């Protein structure tokens, strides 16, 4: 199973791609998509869309896990992240990829088992899960790998994060139908 994790943003989008087979995590690729603050919002979103679309076409993941929006003190920031998420989700839909979202709290719990884990603790667990000699850099790519691992781990556990729209109902490639988590797990076994 191949999963891409995405840490969305307008200036920096982190991505991480992991193959998971027989309880083994294998890194395929990770990195960031960067846009210049000197560009218009529309130009930045076009770059995010185009680059994520290229990554999806190159690596052909079966699933996309993307960080959900959370509380931002700055309304301008939340709007720009929401716009970036929108073009990333569009790229996923157009590439026929099943998608789901995780909040930062869900990722912390999914990686460390502790909702108040520090960024460094999460990065160390990503390093451990993936058997790396050092923590992946930059931070946005490490965050994307954490989102990816959270999704992989959620498929094999009965853990509920308390948000039915994330794990109990997952958008399937058609984009219009919803299936239960049990049906989703059965699809993975085929």
Curated annotation (Swiss-Prot):
The active site is at residues 7, 67, 140. One of its GO terms (molecular function) is magnesium ion binding. Its EC number is 3.1.21.10. It is an enzyme of class 3 (hydrolase). Belongs to the RuvC family. Mg(2+) 1 binds at residues 7, 140. It catalyses: Endonucleolytic cleavage at a junction such as a reciprocal single-stranded crossover between two homologous DNA duplexes (Holliday junction). Mg(2+) 2 binds at residue 67. Binds 2 Mg(2+) ion per subunit. The keyword Nuclease applies. NCBIfam families: PRK00039.2-1, ruvC. InterPro entries: RNaseH-like_sf, RNaseH_sf, X-over_junc_endoDNase_Mg_BS, X-over_junc_endoDNase_RuvC. This is Crossover junction endodeoxyribonuclease RuvC. PANTHER family: CROSSOVER JUNCTION ENDODEOXYRIBONUCLEASE RUVC. Homodimer which binds Holliday junction (HJ) DNA. The HJ becomes 2-fold symmetrical on binding to RuvC with unstacked arms; it has a different conformation from HJ DNA in complex with RuvA. In the full resolvosome a probable DNA-RuvA(4)-RuvB(12)-RuvC(2) complex forms which resolves the HJ. It is found in: Cytoplasm. Keywords: Cytoplasm, DNA damage, DNA recombination, DNA repair, DNA-binding, Endonuclease, Hydrolase, Magnesium, Metal-binding, Nuclease. One of its GO terms (cellular component) is Holliday junction resolvase complex. It comes from Fusobacterium nucleatum subsp. nucleatum (strain ATCC 25586 / DSM 15643 / BCRC 10681 / CIP 101130 / JCM 8532 / KCTC 2640 / LMG 13131 / VPI 4355). GO terms for biological process: DNA recombination; DNA repair. Its cofactor is Mg(2+). The RuvA-RuvB-RuvC complex processes Holliday junction (HJ) DNA during genetic recombination and DNA repair. Endonuclease that resolves HJ intermediates. Cleaves cruciform DNA by making single-stranded nicks across the HJ at symmetrical positions within the homologous arms, yielding a 5'-phosphate and a 3'-hydroxyl group; requires a central core of homology in the junction. The consensus cleavage sequence is 5'-(A/T)TT(C/G)-3'. Cleavage occurs on the 3'-side of the TT dinucleotide at the point of strand exchange.
